Design a protein with these regions (language model features):
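Residues that define the transmembrane beta-barrel architecture of outer-membrane proteins
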Residues: 1, 59-63, 101-105, 154-158
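Generic long, charged, amphipathic alpha-helical segments
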Residues: 80-81, 89-104, 108
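Outer-membrane beta-barrel architecture
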Residues: 2-4, 66-68, 77, 108-112, ...
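C-terminal beta-signal and adjacent terminal beta-strands/loops
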Residues: 24-27, 81-89, 111-166
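Residues embedded in well-ordered secondary-structure elements
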Residues: 7, 56, 98, 110, ...
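Extracellular loop and loop/strand-boundary signature of outer-membrane beta-barrel proteins
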Residues: 48-53, 91-97, 145-150
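Gram-negative outer-membrane beta-barrel transporters
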Residues: 1-90
Length: 166
């Protein structure tokens, strides 16, 4: 669901964008040929780890609220994105782990150098939000501090961008 509203405000234009979704994924049936299952286990092709990736490793809920204000040659963006809880089962070793919901904030400021060229600076994941730490046994024995769930594992990054509109 996406709702967007434009509002003339203070000589500029404020765009308010609200988006959200709820997704529930459940595998209900496998359709392997009988000849294959006669000599192989279903888990060899599609085991508990693959089922977990599809059913629980993506958040069921995700929502975003973005505010984009444009006035004269400037534009300002602030966006908060909510990522819901996810569950990792730890297969083939480890344990079940729930990862708490997180909110990530993006911020940018842009300036129109010409009618066709815009320069923007900003930050994605401004407050350096990370997923919960993995329990030791799920981290491949300390190799991976974070699971690649919800919003990723790279933390914040800052950028400069030059856009040309054709």
């Amino acid at each position: 669901l996406v709702v967007s509203y434009d509002w003339a405000l203070g000589g500029g234009n404020l765009n308010i964008n609200l988006a959200g979704n709820y997704t529930e994924t459940k595998i209900t049936k496998f359709n392997f040929p009988e000849k294959v299952l006669a000599s192989h286990s279903q888990d060899e092709f599609f085991g508990p780890d693959q089922i977990n990736i599809i059913e629980t490793l993506s958040p069921k809920t995700k929502a975003s609220l973005g505010l984009n204000y444009k006035i004269n040659k400037f534009n300002f963006l602030v966006r908060n994105t909510y990522f819901g809880e996810v569950i990792r089962d730890g297969f083939p070793f480890g344990s079940v782990q729930k990862f708490a919901p997180k909110v990530v904030t993006d911020l940018s400021v842009g300036y129109d150098l010409t009618k066709k060229i815009n320069f923007t600076v900003g930050a994605n994941n401004l407050f350096d939000v990370f997923p919960d730490l993995q329990v030791y046994e799920n981290s491949y024995f300390g190799v991976f501090k974070y699971a690649p769930v919800q919003m990723g594992t790279t933390g914040n990054y800052f950028f400069g961008r030059l856009n040309y509109n054709f």
